[in-house]
Amino acid sequence: MLVNREYIRKFLTNNDTKPVPYRWTHGATDEHLGDGLLIYSIIQLLRAKICVCLGSGGGFIPRIMTQARVDLYDTGIFEGDRDYNWGDIGVTYVVDAANKIGGNVDWLEEDSFLRKTFFPRIINETTEIAYKNFFIKEDIKIDYLHIDAGHSYEDVKRDFKQYSKLLSKNGIISIHDTDKNYENNYIVSEDIKDHYKFTDGPSKFIEEISDEWQRFDFFNEGILDTKPSSTGLTILRHA
């Protein structure tokens, strides 16, 4: 067995025994990481240290980012101080205004499972303000960027335009919710209308990506219709 299913179930796909909110959008289950496995693998392969997640309702991707970095240390790739954020293995930043637009967060309190287990650095602001008043001011270069904040076309385009300027030489960008076929098959209950058309912005934006970027779409909707599938993950890197 390549992966520790018990650890995955307790810490990555669940907050101990409670399912991580929105994990299903990644096609994840109790013992399966879904598209999170792609993100984990890319961070491992490219030795990414500075990881930034724009938007995260349940902290699923931030914890995978941190786990990948820690595992790089524990397997002898990273060396030095193992501290999760202030040592030699990099840092995971989560940027989220926690304004309930597009969903709720469950990790804002300091004693939340995510924060006391994986210790991400929280930027409780909009992505636009965080870009200007934190990342620019601290001259941060990003090795892995995950875009999953505002889902309108304008929001996704702005986040990409701004944060892509901060990428390191070998930096990677992933954009979530890019598979419009998933949305076409998904039934939204009347009480959460804010989830309607959640792929419209991301799927429209990726069609406009210039030749300066290599684009890889990872869609598994419809391959196995008896199991959860991802809402779409698109990976971008400089051509």
Which residues are covered by each model-predicted region?
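Non-catalytic N-terminal targeting/anchoring module and adjacent flexible stem/linker
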Residues: 1-3, 238-239
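Class I SAM-dependent methyltransferase Rossmann-like catalytic core
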Residues: 2-46
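S-adenosylmethionine/decaboxylated-SAM
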Residues: 30, 40-239
